[in-house]
């Protein structure tokens, strides 16, 4: 009865941290066009939960799927891959 569930994870770049305890992550993926065969880049913006407001714009993070936390938020930031370079 103790089955483990595979959790979906995605990697993306933080593009907004203006909301409290929430970051907007831009996830890019490459897809082959069905008719022409050209490789194109598609992107999706996902709202993710950031409990301690510790991630900033430009950080590369890994997000994992969770239960719905609000109307638009059902992902949680799980780890930091690369910190944004400060000028």
From Swiss-Prot:
Sorted alphabetically, which keywords does the UniProt record give?
A: Ribonucleoprotein, Ribosomal protein, RNA-binding, rRNA-binding
Leader sequence segment: none
BP GO annotations: translation
Can the keyword Acyltransferase be found in this entry's annotation? no
Give the GO cellular component terms, alphabetically.
cytosolic small ribosomal subunit
GO MF annotation, one: rRNA binding
The job of this chain, per UniProt, is described as: One of the primary rRNA binding proteins, it binds specifically to the 5'-end of 16S ribosomal RNA.
Family per UniProt?
Belongs to the universal ribosomal protein uS17 family.
Q: How does it assemble?
A: Part of the 30S ribosomal subunit.
This chain's protein is named: Small ribosomal subunit protein uS17
Q: Give the organism's phylogenetic lineage.
A: Bacteria, Pseudomonadati, Pseudomonadota, Betaproteobacteria, Neisseriales
